[in-house]
């Protein structure tokens, strides 16, 4: 199944980054470019369009030339709120979401998720040890359920994904591609990589 003409890539950069001391994680530099740019650059060859979901420093993200989507729900309620805002503000049926702190996304992420979808409205990455529900291919058809879930005060991504009939896709052969950058110490370790 090849959906690359109709999938919009979304870099999720709207979090509070508490473990990063509150710094806007997407704007932290790795190898001379911001973390969000690593993700956008990895997604761009796989998709027709890439947008950014962000809540702070919107002018900096907008300077990239990419469309920037702020959350429609106040107070940084989490990645599901960013996903809902994208559904509300961007046309299309399919969206590939990826957090800004995963700088080594594989070149075949979209094709592998799409090929293993098997009719599900949501599929996400499993690296062989853990789920990565914010690295997910999601159909707009879940928007009503997502709206209701958030209105009920729920925020847990994994529970929502399972409730709407999603499943994980095995990426255990490239587990290292899903190591993310959560703390200043982890960023320092990433800076030492070749």
Curated annotation (Swiss-Prot):
Q: What is recorded about the domains?
A: The N-terminal domain determines nucleotide recognition and specific binding, while the C-terminal domain determines the specific binding to the target protein.
Q: Which reaction does it catalyse?
A: Mo-molybdopterin + GTP + H(+) = Mo-molybdopterin guanine dinucleotide + diphosphate
Name used for this protein in its record: Molybdenum cofactor guanylyltransferase
The free-text function statement in the UniProt record for this protein reads: Transfers a GMP moiety from GTP to Mo-molybdopterin (Mo-MPT) cofactor (Moco or molybdenum cofactor) to form Mo-molybdopterin guanine dinucleotide (Mo-MGD) cofactor.
Positions contributing to GTP binding: 12-14, 25, 71, 101
Query: Per its UniProt record, what Pfam families does this chain match?
Result: NTP_transf_3
Q: Name one GO cellular component term.
A: cytoplasm
What domain of life does the UniProt record list for this protein's source? Answer: Bacteria
Cofactors (names): Mg(2+)
GO BP terms, alphabetized: bis(molybdopterin guanine dinucleotide)molybdenum biosynthetic process
- Bilayer-spanning residue ranges: none
- For whether the record's keyword set contains Lyase, the answer is no
Provide the E.C. number(s) assigned to this enzyme.
Answer: 2.7.7.77
Q: Which GO terms describe its molecular function?
A: GTP binding; metal ion binding; molybdenum cofactor guanylyltransferase activity; nucleotidyltransferase activity
> Which protein family is it in?
Belongs to the MobA family.
Question: Where does it reside?
Answer: Cytoplasm
Q: Which residues bind Mg(2+)?
A: 101
Q: What class of enzyme is it?
A: transferase
Work out whether the entry's keyword set contains Transferase. yes
**Which proteins does it associate with, and in what oligomeric form?**
Monomer.
CDD domains attached here? Answer: MobA
Write the record's keywords in alphabetical order, separated by commas: Cytoplasm, GTP-binding, Magnesium, Metal-binding, Molybdenum cofactor biosynthesis, Nucleotide-binding, Transferase
């Amino acid at each position: 199944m090849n959906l690359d003409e109709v999938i919009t890539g979304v870099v999720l950069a709207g979090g509070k980054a508490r473990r990063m001391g509150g710094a806007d994680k997407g704007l932290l530099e790795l190898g001379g470019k911001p973390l969000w740019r690593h993700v956008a650059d990895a997604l761009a060859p796989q998709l027709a369009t890439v947008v950014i979901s962000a809540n702070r420093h919107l002018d900096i993200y907008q300077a990239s030339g990419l469309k920037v989507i702020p959350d429609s729900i106040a107070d940084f309620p989490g990645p599901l709120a960013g996903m809902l805002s994208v559904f509300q503000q961007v046309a299309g049926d399919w969206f590939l979401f990826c957090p800004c702190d995963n700088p080594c996304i594989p070149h075949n992420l979209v094709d592998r998720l799409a090929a293993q979808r098997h009719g599900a409205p949501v599929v996400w990455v499993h690296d062989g040890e853990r789920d990565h529900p914010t690295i997910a291919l999601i159909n707009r058809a879940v928007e009503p359920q997502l709206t209701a879930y958030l209105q009920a005060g729920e925020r847990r991504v994994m529970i929502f994904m399972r409730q709407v009939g999603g499943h994980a896709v095995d990426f255990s052969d490239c587990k290292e591609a899903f190591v993310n950058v959560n703390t200043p110490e982890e960023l320092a370790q990433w800076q030492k990589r070749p």
